[in-house]
């Protein structure tokens, strides 16, 4: 039996997904509303006692407090999980280290009813004790999800990688949107104008890989165009451009552009 503490978007979506794939869900303990098609428990201890696997699906900052609030005698022999990308299984202080695990899905849950097809495509990253990892691996095998096991000491680097591929992409898109507005685009048109470019680039990267998807002046070694860009960029936008272009120069093999990219604005 699988129980959930916390009824947010991720918890509710995963409960439905596991149930759809044959998992038995005991229910939820949560201070917020839970879906009507699940049993509600009045205390954390009650759901722990009624479950073999417990997923604590609260915000990262609340995991430790929720864990400390559960009677330690209730969790003996239970498999305990959280789904944070940033926290390791060490947040479950005092627990049997073999019985705890972080199981992070590389997916942004859009609602409490995230479609099963979306979750099935999610890659899960596991970190924790052998027994807990084996149990959740078996669950994910049944669901058809891919997963990898990492060591706790690389969890911050892992989470930074996830941020690079999601949050920081959003930041780059925001900078591009601002630049188009400076060119005279209406704010409501700027992002929609960029959308096909963004979508096609992400699709190419996912389908073809990094190197085959390279386009633009840096990938061609076009120093003249790069200089024109640098002449009109200032402040944070220029810093972002030069740093990311240096990465592209290394990937594409056009390292002759690096001195130009490292040159100060008015040097």
Show where each model-derived region lies:
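NAD(P)+-binding Rossmann beta1-loop-alpha1 motif at the extreme N-terminus of oxidoreductases
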Residues: 1-46
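Rossmann-like NAD(P)(H) cofactor-binding subdomain of soluble oxidoreductases
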Residues: 14, 32-37, 41-115
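Internal alpha-helical scaffold of NAD(P)-dependent oxidoreductase catalytic cores
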Residues: 24, 33, 97, 115-206, ...
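Amphipathic, non-transmembrane alpha-helical scaffold segments
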Residues: 55, 162-169, 234, 241, ...
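Predominantly flavin-linked oxidoreductase catalytic cores and closely associated redox partners
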Residues: 95, 106-115, 130-132, 211-219
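Interdomain hinge/lid region at the active-site interface
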Residues: 201-258, 267
């Amino acid at each position: 039996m699988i129980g959930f503490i916390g009824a947010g978007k991720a918890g509710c979506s995963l409960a439905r997904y596991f149930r759809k794939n044959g998992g038995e869900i005991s229910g939820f303990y949560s201070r917020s509303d839970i879906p009507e098609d699940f049993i509600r428990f009045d205390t954390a201890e009650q759901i722990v006692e009624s479950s073999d696997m417990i997923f604590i699906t609260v915000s990262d900052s609340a995991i430790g407090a929720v864990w400390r609030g559960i009677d330690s005698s209730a969790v003996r022999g239970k498999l305990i999980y959280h789904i944070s990308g940033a926290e390791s299984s060490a947040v479950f202080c005092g627990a049997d280290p073999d019985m705890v695990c972080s199981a992070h899905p590389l997916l942004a849950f859009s609602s409490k009813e995230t479609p099963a097809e979306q979750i099935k495509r999610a890659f899960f990253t596991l970190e924790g004790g052998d027994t807990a990892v084996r149990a959740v691996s078996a669950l994910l095998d049944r669901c058809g999800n891919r997963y990898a096991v990492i060591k706790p000491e690389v969890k911050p680097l892992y989470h930074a990688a996830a941020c690079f591929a999601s949050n920081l992409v959003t930041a780059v898109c925001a900078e591009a949107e601002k630049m188009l507005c400076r060119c005279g685009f209406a704010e409501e048109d700027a992002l929609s104008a960029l959308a096909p470019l963004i979508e096609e680039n992400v699709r190419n990267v996912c389908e073809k890989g990094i190197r085959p998807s390279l386009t633009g002046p840096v990938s061609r070694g076009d120093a003249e165009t790069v200089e024109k860009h640098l002449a009109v960029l200032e402040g944070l936008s220029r810093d972002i451009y030069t740093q990311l272009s240096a990465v592209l120069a290394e990937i594409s093999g056009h390292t002759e552009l690096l001195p130009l990219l490292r040159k100060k604005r008015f040097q």
